[in-house]
């Protein structure tokens, strides 16, 4: 068939698949931990795109793990029961009543919805919270006056490794308990980073509501596509990385220091952001790499 009769759209799809081949080969059998939150949880079109991306990762031989929060839905349910959401230094103040709502929403509603959507899309998802099987052991946060807000004390990866080996997709909510069984609300970025480290993951990917790390927050086109750990720390010291981006970058740095090969901060408002970041030469966000990182196919060099 002559090339002029080939539909342009079909040719584009084949070109994209060809571009993805080195990445498909490199990442087959590797674990990728995705923190799912932000706008990607609020818009139906974006929800569907994320679920399709996650199932795609599993279908091409990767081992996706999903860790999620659910801030907007928590706020909505707190409003229904007459509790005013309160925050201190970016952390949700979590008294006993708030903790009960957080646990109900994250474990009983958001988690089950994600599991159902992945399964409906053709994946095999299994829902967890950090308390299940003592997957995540919590401890109280160092900051005083914020109630039942926790940090990750340890991760028991043996709970989910057998599932990954059999092709299941773990979906984990960021609620965990301490040694005494007290439940804590933990930042989902933190949980994702620690689980990625425990699984020796290839990638940690944070879906956010920003393009990535910007040289100038007022200029979306100033995206920094790739950084190492010292460069990331320097951007924090210079104030270029500030506000809510600091804990995300810190989370990435901690996971890299514990053996994760690359951490990505990407814009979850873009449909199919996961696939665009992992399987295209240009990517769409910021990738932070550790000192020993080596990529067989390095598009930015």
Swiss-Prot record:
Keyword Aminoacyl-tRNA synthetase tagged: no
Catalytic activity: N-acetyl-L-glutamate + ATP = N-acetyl-L-glutamyl 5-phosphate + ADP
Gene Ontology terms describing biological process: arginine biosynthetic process via ornithine; L-arginine biosynthetic process
Organism: Synechococcus elongatus (strain ATCC 33912 / PCC 7942 / FACHB-805) (Anacystis nidulans R2)
Entry GO CC: cytoplasm
Name used for this protein in its record: Acetylglutamate kinase
EC id: 2.7.2.8
Superkingdom per UniProt: Bacteria
